[in-house]
Regions:
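Active-site acidic/histidine clusters and adjacent loop/turn architecture
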Residues: 74-77
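Short beta-strand scaffold segments in enzyme catalytic cores
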Residues: 110-113
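Basic phosphate/pyrophosphate-binding loop/patch that engages nucleotide-derived ligands
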Residues: 117
Length: 257
């Protein structure tokens, strides 16, 4: 990633250019990213192809001010961290459903490993998740504004991530390339069984909570208080995307047939 792109990316998330790669810088970038670059599946509902290249993701997230899902968000964030001097690896993960009784296929999720004096799990692409990177080699609970997290060993040398006692996903501790995720990314876009095709969704952290648009509903959470507003017209939906995410969409996202 060229330095002009790095500066534009940092401007996108409201971050200064760091002098060196430190854990404090990593935590700050992680929090800012979650507050400014939303987790969203709108490309699927706007008939926009998702292309997993650094150039395409930079155009979408930095140039056009959009968001994306895990492959896009964590894939590009990893490139930013590399350009800033961090030692980074991409990791494939399975999502743990129904308390861990269901384990989805590997490559269902992309996470990032950063090596500093210790290892950190970085994830800006799992929706409502940890605000800050998680310490990989820390056996005790980790308190975070989003909840209590545990990173524990799993069978076969893998690693499980739990949030408030609920299993979230299982990470395979083997370095991957972004191109390794192209086929699962295609599946998430086109397969009838992909849950990303069900409903348009866009969500990001705020300083004191979270804001989400799901279909024709606007959900706003501040602390423990949540409000839900029905967006009754197409204009209401488009206005919500612009007000809360800065998106000027030409049409309302609609589930694919």
């Amino acid at each position: 990633m060229e330095m002009d792109t790095v500066r534009s990316y940092l401007s996108r998330i409201g971050a200064p250019t760091p002098a060196e790669p430190t854990v404090e810088v990593l935590r700050d970038l992680h929090r800012r990213h979650l507050e400014t670059v939303p987790f969203e599946n709108l490309s699927i509902h706007l008939d926009e192809p998702i292309v997993l290249t650094t150039e395409a993701l930079t155009d979408k997230i930095v140039g056009r001010g959009r968001g994306g899902f895990c492959y896009e968000l964590n894939g590009l964030f990893a490139e930013l961290l590399r350009a800033l001097g961090f030692e980074v690896e991409l990791l494939a993960a399975s999502v743990l459903v129904d308390g861990g009784r269901i384990v989805t296929p590997i490559f269902d999720h992309l996470a990032v490993l950063v090596r500093l004096e210790e290892r950190y799990l970085v994830d800006v692409g799992f929706g409502a998740h940890a605000t800050y990177p998680l310490r990989v080699d820390w056996p005790e609970a980790q308190e975070d504004p989003a909840g209590e997290f545990l990173v524990v060993d799993a069978p076969g040398g893998d690693m499980d991530v739990l949030m408030d006692g609920v299993p979230q996903y299982r990470v395979e501790m083997r370095p991957r390339r972004l191109s390794d995720f192209e086929r699962p990314c295609w599946w998430q876009q086109h397969a009838p069984d992909s849950h990303f095709r069900d409903t348009p969704r866009c969500s990001r952290n705020t300083e004191d909570g979270r804001v989400t648009v799901v279909g024709d509903r606007l959900l706003e959470t501040v602390g423990d208080h949540r409000t839900e507003t029905t967006l009754t017209t197409d204009e209401d939906v488009l206005s919500a995307y612009e007000k809360h995410f800065g998106f000027r969409l030409a049409k309302v996202p609609t589930p694919p047939v």
